[in-house]
Amino acid sequence: MGFSLIASAAILAVTLFMAVEIITGALLPTLDGINTSYGELKNRINDQLQTHINITTVSRSANGGNYNYNISVQNTGSVTLKTEKFAVLVNGVAYPASCSCAYIYPQNIGYFTLTNITSGGATRIKIISDNGIADYYMYTP
């Protein structure tokens, strides 16, 4: 009876050791990934809190039956914004826009150009930055 008790205790100890090894081997990388994701989330929230944009002027010129828009956007926050990730909506429809610069640094202005836009009359314009902060402008000719 003494040998079987020692053998069963050894088997249980080895099984427990293997179970702990499997659990920690799978759990530690997951916890590291969660920690990294949480750090990225904090950085993104911090960037959103420090991002402010303002549409300063909008001008429109006729291009045949369509219109070209020139929109100036000022970065009034403290985060540098990447303009290639901006979205420009005219009356709720996204249009491709080109910008005069790759980045809008704090307290600087970027100039966006939209060509061949079909909407005339009063126009609602929305600019969305790369981290989701937006500004609205109502253009009336």
Regions found by a protein language model. Name each.
Residues P29-P141:
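N-terminal export/assembly leader peptides and their processing motifs that target proteins to secretory
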Residues A10-G39:
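C-terminal juxtamembrane segment of a hydrophobic transmembrane alpha-helix
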